[in-house]
Amino acid sequence: YRLYGEAVVKAAVENGSSHVDISGEPAWIESMQMKYSEQAKEKGVFIVSACGWDSIPCDMGMEFLKKNFDGTLTYAETFAKINTGESGYSFNAGTYQTLILGIWKAKDDGLGRIRKAIMPEKLEKTRWRAPKRSTFWYNDKLKCYCLPFLGADKSIVQRSQYFDAQMDKKFPAMIETYICVKSGFWALALLAWLMIFQIAVKFSWTRNILQKYPDICSAYMFKNSGPTRQQAEEATFEYWFFGTGWNETTIPPPVEEQPNKKVVVRCDGPDAGYIATSGCVLSGVFTSAAAFKNTKIYDRLASFGIVFRTVPEMAST
């Protein structure tokens, strides 16, 4: 999308056609809002990005959590778990190439400037934030090791919360996103690979090698062919939301009081890369939650096996 997506968005807006995509690149997504939001409003069309696995489960999960909190949500921690079958799993190299471009062009994106343009108003915040976590830590509730999730989910949710606050006058919730890895060894291996990968991307000769040999350079975590049909059929995902806030629904909420309520939401679905992503693509410039929250999206997602539900809070061990 960074290389070719703008031409499609521009053509859609100019010709009065709405546009839905499965992009996962925050800089591109937010620059499209900055450039085309007003024109889209004038034309009466919708530009809705990140409608694949990035970031329907997370964005709509946060919306589901807020709707079912029965109080005021102040922050949430989210955890994505990819469950593979006996055949293993390889992600498509397109995601890998996007990651290379994202890291390489990060300094030139001007993301801070873009965000000031599309979200000029400061949102109300409280001193109650999600716990500070180390880069690598063990989640004793989900029985997995956690690393920061580098996808678009956090930025998409932040924009949805801004829209919620500005348009619907709802208290904005903060979010921290993580990816779960089953073993400490593989979590450390993934962390080490990411560190080396980020350094290698900065130099043209190593970047060319990374781009040319995605399978070898990622230890076959990414392949040009993507997962096999059997791998996709065996794979599933879980997305967990641990919300914290207050029982009260007053506006403004009792921000000086310590949060007194917790709600847990779980989303389950099939293979994230293909089956869930195709199910997520549903029929100004919006996030998925801003565009779809008052529709029958949850029923639509359920028909593809992507189900949201509240679950009892789990105790730490």
Region locations from a protein language model:
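Rossmann-fold NAD(P)-binding glycine/threonine-rich loop
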Residues: 3-10, 23-45
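Anion (oxyanion) recognition and catalysis
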Residues: 13, 41, 302
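Gly/Ser/Thr-rich loops at beta-strand to alpha-helix junctions
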Residues: 26-28, 51-59, 69
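Active-site Tyr-X1-5-Lys
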Residues: 32-39, 60-69
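C-terminal catalytic/substrate-binding lobe primarily of soluble NAD(P)-dependent oxidoreductases
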Residues: 44, 66-317
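Short beta-strand elements at the ligand-binding edges of bilobed clamshell
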Residues: 45-51
